[in-house]
């Protein structure tokens, strides 16, 4: 009897200390896995800011002062930044008050850029059909669909990026009216709580090489039958390692 009385306070303490709300655990996990830097101030842009050469945002938060419209298609005029061919955007936090995050109109470098909350797409890669796009460091979270949308041709290099709560980290455009052969190289990426890390169109010769860690990510690399019919959705062909999707399965957990 005495032993039972002594154990009762310990049982009550343990019972009340256990969280019953599953979202509390998710919130803790998000804070632990998405290391967004502290903002040094905020800037609301009334129109898209175009970047030629190098723009260093000084780790301030930049937005457009508008509400996200979800997956409703936006355009260049809705972007926070548009980076011209050969431009560099670095040390920026993209706030939640925007429809489109960043456009690249050709080869570009996106360095230490963070998306607080992704709206339609975080980063759209456009251009004349070739070039190299570098995403170095930074991260994005809360993307219902795509983080990086690759519409142009060429090569995308994603290095040391962190992504959390997302639909797809990278997607080669599945139904652009003009299609290209595209490649993506992923290294040092940390991915948490997502549906698909990479989506490519293997029928157009797309390739992906992946060296990353992933926790609670359903598919690492998905191959689609891409189309140039903008009104048609591409069909999923397969998922997993292949000649087009190069990685060691399973990826290590983050």
UniProtKB/Swiss-Prot annotation:
Signal peptide residues on this chain, from the entry's feature table: 1-17
Entry keyword annotation includes Cell wall biogenesis/degradation: yes
GO CC list: extracellular region
Entry note: cofactor: Binds 1 Ca(2+) ion per subunit.
GO BP term, pick one: pectin catabolic process
Residues bearing glycans: 175
Chief location: secreted
Co-factor(s): Ca(2+)
Protein name in the entry: Probable pectate lyase E
Gene name, Swiss-Prot/TrEMBL: plyE
